[in-house]
Amino acid sequence: MQKCAGHAPLVTAASRVSQDTVDALLQAILKAYHKLASIDSHINDPVEIAFKLINSFKYLPISGSSVKDFESELRELDVFSPLLQSAVTAANNSNIIWDLIAVLFAYISIHKQLHPLILHNLNIWKDFMADNDEETATTTDGDSMNFGVLSLLSIVQNFEEITPNLFEFLKLGLRSTLLKIWVAQWQRYDPSATNLINGDEKISSWITKDYQVDFFIITSLASTSSLEVLPSHYFVYKISKRISHFPNLIDPKLYRSAISTIMENGISDNGGGENSSDKIDPTDLSFHLQVLMEVIDHPELNYLQENRLILLLDIALNYLILVPTHCLHSNFGELGSTQSLASTLNIIQFLLSKFLINMGSISQLINQYNRKCITTNNINNNNINNNGVINGSTNTTSTTTTTITNNNNNSNNSSISNNNRKIDWTQSYQTRYQIPYWFEDSILPPIPPISKSLFTFDKNLDHESDSIMIVNDVLRCLNLTILLISKLLRDYDDLKINPLIQSSDDHSNEDNHVIIEQYMQLYLVPLFTSLLLAQQLKDRGQERDEGHKEKEENINLIGSSSVKKLFSQLIFFSSLKLCENLVIKEKNLALYHLIKFATKVSLDDLILQKISINLLNHLFFHQIRDGSDDDNLIKKLCLKNQLSFQALKDYITLWNDGSEVYNAFYKELFYEEQPKIKPIKLTTSDLLKLFPEDVQFVISTPPNTITSASTSDNCTSSQSAAQKNIENFTTLSKYDVYSSTSFIPSTSKNTNTNVSKQQQQPQNSTPCSSNRFLFNKSSLISQESNGSNNNSGTQGPGSMNESYSLDNSFNTTNTNMTRQPTTLTRATDAMTTAPTTPIPYKNTSGSSNNNLWIESPMTNFKGSTISKSTNKSKMVNTGKNYILGGHNKVKNNSRAQSIHIDDFENENN
């Protein structure tokens, strides 16, 4: 067991099968090729045979067999003509057949012993393209994906079975890629050439294109199984990184060579001993598990700056998914981790999803603001040009004067615009994709600051990948993490392992329901975060398809809309399978907590509500089938359990909007007619009146909308210089300074001045720069404020907008995003959540001391009711009037605060 756990073999899942089985499978595939080549398309369907072929290829390992072993047998076989004829004659399913042909072509390409099927039939492709005028019919769409063969096969291998429904779901559109790229590459390929790379210049022209690198790997490198044919170490490392993504599709010898190259590229010059990074064993299971622990030890990392860590994580996940579960647990337990293996993987899933959501939201905000600036500049330029033409019609002198004046005004306007750009770029737009604040609190353990491990550093930083490549690697790691968690759940179910079983010595049965809820949240929180990411990718891709094309200057870190759509589908499908495996393992326990969790998150955000109902719809009506009959397994579980059934019915009844997505629940589960819903329109003020009075106090009606240009300008101009100085100062201070005046010694002469200045600003005014952090720890921008601007046109009740200051956002030394709630949707949430912007303290008593150290005005915002004025019983005069410049409103952090001591001192006073 120890040997298995410490050094699990670096092999693919298929190679664990005996060689006799592999030979038998290969002979069966060859017989299928003979049948496909001689088939009569009018009698038999070649498409059916092709689907069986590509599903068999998943179990055929990549071997080092020579091409000559099958040269004579495959020379005369034509397996593509029957399929091409079916694609031409098919009416509605032609795209599915083209995707099928492309996948079959890709599988043949990665097995070098089957290359004669392509090389001896190139004339067939040439004649077909000429007869069907494919030169003009397959022009490549600028926004489509140009797959490499390895990229395509790594996608389809995520699915247990390749079916027509899968191609209909993915809509890959591989016809253009097959005919214009892959076939053309093989037509230019010369297998007799010993060296296809004639210097750095030639390889540099195609090293950035994945489909070119994939073709080089499956042809030239497959013939040598060595990286020595490459002209320089730079290209060796670049192609090694590409090879590391596909352990099941590369010759094992070549894959091991690539992994060793990556491991040796660490900081070996810093160690010099036995523990230096060039001594890392790529087959050491403990090292790959340490990579997982490194990710959760540093949850605040910006993965765009951690190219090597993400690369090692990708390698580790590809390795771990092939290791037996008992070996994983045996070795992980010896590392002394405070987290279980399942907990570690779920935390990684959450961190990767959270990073991608926040990154996408930031890029979306920047793109929207850039478009706004471009539109504003165009309007200003048009106005200037129009004024110049009008003034120019008078005389030459006035024309010159007007031009100079307009240029000066334009320069001044540009200067003002640049000064305000950092301040209001986050005020004009609001992101739609918010992670509930309690997600992070419920899943991330408190982790003290820990230094990074040496193996995460890279001694050669000149070959860093670009941001788009790193983001794609993070997306791939996220999908692998979800697949690995699903695999563990399946193994736990097969082995009858129940982590919720308590030992006989544990008598805390009264807390059993709490443990169960925490266990379910361990899976459901990352699951819904990944589904939120999938929804974000889907929506962003649809925006581009509908004509909102992003201009060249805009930030786009994921790629075209096709790439976004594909990753969205992969993450959604993998998350759906994870949820299925969780329900299969835990039965009604998981189903009830899933419905309960969906009810909770739906009240937080309408996008999460949309995700929840789509997930439930797929689970109940489109997925798992019971083996005994055709009934849905989850449907049967729900009907047998009254708790789950009633929870589901309450949820559907609450959110039913009359749409088709709710109809199946009424028709197939509740056996009743779907109630007809009459839509109504409400203004924001009318909607707020439906809230309880204490919630209305927190969610006050804004005077203007946040998208108003005048509001933004007035907000910026009304902000005093003293207030800016205070905010810049507080980012470096340990004290929590609120809306206070600049440094004025607290004396009797200026006491009234201080109070009057505090009272000049209305309490309903919009806070311009009251927030010191751009990010929250779980959401891009905090959604809760007192008197903040509220965009009622796009957000539901409980989605609040708030203006932020960018110049102060990044001055903070705190690297963690602050944990703050993102929504206020229920009275209970409002009564336990403090708004970001405090209420200015007004001293109404002339005899009382105006220089009190008070707590945050909303410190006691946890009672059953909300006090609209500061509780004076908690104000304490410590006598420290000149600390931090004598600010009147700061937390007394200079000593430990005790409510009882403070009350006692006030009573004595």
UniProtKB/Swiss-Prot annotation:
GO (cellular component) term, any one: RNA N6-methyladenosine methyltransferase complex
Disruption phenotype: Severely decreases N6-methyladenosine (m6A) levels following meiotic induction. Abnormal cell cycle arrest in meiotic interphase before premeiotic DNA replication. Increases the rate of degradation of KAR4, MUM2 and IME4 protein. Increases RME1 protein levels, and decreases IME1 transcript levels. Decreases RNA level of genes involved in translation and ribosome biogenesis, and early meiotic genes. Partially suppressed by disruption of RME1.
The keyword Phosphoprotein is assigned to this record: yes
Example of a GO biological process term: positive regulation of transcription by RNA polymerase II
Polar residues bias (residue ranges): 746-784, 800-810
Residues covered by region (Disordered): 746-824
Cellular localization per UniProt: Cytoplasm; Nucleus, Nucleolus
Sites bearing Phosphoserine, chain numbering: 856, 898
Keyword line: Cytoplasm, Nucleus, Phosphoprotein
Coiled coil: none
Other facts: Present with 486 molecules/cell in log phase SD medium.
Assembly information from the UniProt record: Component of the MIS (mRNA N6-methyladenosine (m6A) methylation) complex, at least composed of IME4, KAR4, MUM2, SLZ1, and VIR1. Interacts with KAR4. Interacts with SLZ1. Interacts with MUM2. Interacts with IME4.
Homology family: Belongs to the vir family.
Role summary: Component of the MIS complex, a complex that mediates N6-methyladenosine (m6A) methylation of meiotic mRNAs and is required for initiation of meiosis, progression through the meiotic divisions and sporulation. In the complex, performs a scaffolding role stabilizing the other complex members.
Protein name according to UniProt: Protein virilizer
Chain's gene name: VIR1
